Design a protein with these regions (language model features):
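Transmembrane alpha-helices and adjacent helix-loop boundaries
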Residues: 1-198
Length: 198
């Protein structure tokens, strides 16, 4: 439908975010549906992964010239950073259950959103500069490049994600989750949902 012109530009712009949110919904279904824990921190982890991969893409646009390879390296780096933050948040939070787990994970997502809204990051020949005040307080040289511009986010990144890549990632996610559910660990996950004491 895209190549024949039968799809509006609005719908074309919504296809990649729809794929992204489908992947998040699959992960949320694994946590809430199969594990039985009400964790609402997925948006915060998704935010960390997205900003890390976009910042890597923006910072290495001049040095990493192969766009396809840069995209997949950024994807892996974003997933690893989100996983590390998930592990670090999970250490103290795993003792909680029910509404308390939901409150703490929701608070984590809000904290991440508020930090990123005030974060300014730039790069120049002196290195990487951070500020939580404004762009002027970075103290960059005139030829410096902004990576994260506070509430504006990361601007000027190349649009490398496509609907085809999104569908492939949805299928990979479904494959991994279905194999996990049907494995020994998946049966243990569902046993936790059915009987926490066991």
């Amino acid at each position: 439908m895209i190549t024949t012109g039968n799809m509006s530009s609005l719908m074309q712009g919504l296809l990649v975010p729809m794929c992204t949110y489908s992947i998040v919904a699959i992960g949320l279904n694994l946590c809430v549906g199969y594990l039985g824990e009400l964790s609402i921190g997925h948006a915060g982890f998704m935010c960390i992964g997205a900003f890390t991969s976009a910042a890597f893409t923006k910072a290495t646009m001049d040095t990493f010239t192969n766009a396809g390879l840069r995209f997949f390296v950024a994807l892996i780096i974003g997933a690893v950073c989100a996983g590390i933050f998930g592990f670090l948040i999970g250490i103290p939070v795993l003792r909680l259950k029910g509404d308390y787990l939901a409150i703490v994970t929701l608070a984590f997502g809000e904290i991440i959103k508020n930090i990123i809204n005030v974060l300014y990051v730039g790069i120049d020949s002196n290195g990487i500069h951070f500020s939580m005040k404004d762009q002027m307080s970075l103290g960059m040289e005139p030829g410096g490049k902004m990576i994260i511009s506070g509430a504006m986010g990361i601007t000027g990144t190349p649009r490398q994600s496509t609907f085809t890549i999104g569908v492939i990632l949805i299928l990979v996610t479904l494959f991994v989750v279905l194999n996990l559910i049907n494995s020994r660990d998946g049966r243990a996950i569902m046993a936790i949902r059915d009987n926490r004491i066991a």
